Amino acid sequence: MAKDIKFSEDARRAMLRGVDQLANAVKVTLGPKGRNVVLEKKFGSPLITNDGVTIAKEIELEDPFENMGAKLVSEVASKTNDVAGDGTTTATVLAQAMIQEGLKNVTAGANPVGVRRGIEKAVATAIEELKAISKPIESKESIAQVAAISSGDEEVGKLIAEAMERVGNDGVITIEESKGFATELDVVEGMQFDRGYTSPYMVTDSDKMEAVLEKPYILITDKKINNIQEILPVLEQVVQQGRPMLIIAEDVEGEAQATLVLNKLRGTFNVVAVKAPGFGDRRKAMLEDIAILTGGQVITEDLGLELKTATVDQLGTANKVVVTKDDTTIVEGAGDSTQISARVNQIRAQMEETTSEFDREKLQERLAKLAGGVAVVKVGAATETELKERKLRIEDALNSTRAAVEEGIVAGGGTALVSIYNKVAALEAEGDVETGINIVLRSLEEPVRQIAHNAGLEGSVIVERLKHEAVGVGFNAANGEWVNMIDAGIVDPTKVTRSALQNASSVAALLLTTEAVVADQPDENGPAAVPDMGMGGMGGMM
């Protein structure tokens, strides 16, 4: 395949055209008066969204050089989304501003390497200043404000604040599509796993089709139970105590299942069997989690333990267990709190070490079940199109809130970036390094300009006034008033603002130092013709 090569000014200009096309499509969504973008989908209805990264990922340009520029900025949005979960539009706006200003200066004769050093120096100072003015998030109201600003909906803010309060920082909050119109919160207290009873005859409440066990013993094993004789000794001990029993095993089948169901129906004892959650090594780890949570032991041959010699002392206990056809929930397990804490720390250490996103997600789920809880936000809407858009906004709000809890908050609406302007401007440098610093200074103003522009106002006027206002005072584009941003609840997570600035400067510096761009030449003949597959001598067949 032959290649097209462009050098210096031609190369950078071609990439800038791509940067501008992508950034211009994304930046219309910024701020409280930002608009939506409609994305065509090959199947189903179009997607309407104001999520920067979703828009950026959809954009493919015909010209390969322009497309490379667009993809570089798309990477800024993706990386910011991966790290902070929000702020993708801000990152795109910052990247475009730095690239545009940088190319003007490089075209005018500035050395790109010196400019790059200036950009890096200015951004390092800006990030230090952002950390210095960051305020920790302390109340449920603050969490609600962050989520409301990100999603543009106060009700969503309250919902996410309540979810985070109920499950804690280690809890898992998932977002699902609801069948109805309302958006609601469903919180699962205790440990829940997705395995239900092995037989519907085990239910205690036939209206709700669930089995509720009060203060049960819990037998945990990784073995299949086929023969009732294996568990008879421990069953007899539990019956003597007069308490119900939950059996968690790889499977309970055949004669063992039949005997348990028969005795349950006769009222001899109350027992429910469920399959162990997970598979392979993950199953072993989850069974150990359940054992630690309930103060029991996993009956496994790995530890030299057998079912027929198991005693009541090796069983776990809990205040209550609820089993449905799909799920088992263990509420208030009787495990030792120091052992649970040690297990939580062990899982945290594994999360830090793993390189797999899937493994990290599964470890986070295990951590939540041990330490926090699980909350499900069920998103409702009138149409499928609205549902998708609403779900994306709530996901952004959730990520934004987590970032705020992690690193604190700064004044929102682009105010924080302008408030650190003077500290960055005070940096001493000369020549091309100074040019790099000035490029960053210009870009720090850009989010405020764009928010004002989207609200139908002149950005430059707002920026100039903002520079002379007291620290923390900013422009509320939603109603056109000048207010103390943090007091008014207009806040951004520090992590989101920091990540946007870091990722934008990284890609801008790389693009400015580009001297040649190589792309595949378009194939002018189009795709090769498909050979005729007709079979000779069979022309008469229709």
UniProtKB/Swiss-Prot annotation:
One of its GO terms (molecular function) is unfolded protein binding. SUPFAM superfamilies: GroEL apical domain-like, GroEL equatorial domain-like, GroEL-intermediate domain like. ATP binds at T29, L30, G31, P32, D86, G87, T88, T89, T90, G413, N476, A477, A478, D492. Its EC number is 5.6.1.7. GO terms for biological process: protein refolding. It comes from the Bacteria. It catalyses: ATP + H2O + a folded polypeptide = ADP + phosphate + an unfolded polypeptide. Keywords: ATP-binding, Chaperone, Cytoplasm, Isomerase, Nucleotide-binding. InterPro entries: Chaperonin_Cpn60_CS, Cpn60/GroEL, Cpn60/GroEL/TCP-1, GroEL-like_apical_dom_sf, GROEL-like_equatorial_sf, TCP-1-like_intermed_sf. It is found in: Cytoplasm. GO terms for cellular component: cytoplasm. PROSITE patterns: CHAPERONINS_CPN60. Belongs to the chaperonin (HSP60) family. NCBIfam families: GroEL (TIGR02348), PRK00013.1 (NF000592), PRK12849.1 (NF009487), PRK12850.1 (NF009488), PRK12851.1 (NF009489). Forms a cylinder of 14 subunits composed of two heptameric rings stacked back-to-back. Interacts with the co-chaperonin GroES. Together with its co-chaperonin GroES, plays an essential role in assisting protein folding. The GroEL-GroES system forms a nano-cage that allows encapsulation of the non-native substrate proteins and provides a physical environment optimized to promote and accelerate protein folding. This is Chaperonin GroEL. It comes from Listeria welshimeri serovar 6b (strain ATCC 35897 / DSM 20650 / CCUG 15529 / CIP 8149 / NCTC 11857 / SLCC 5334 / V8). The gene is groEL.
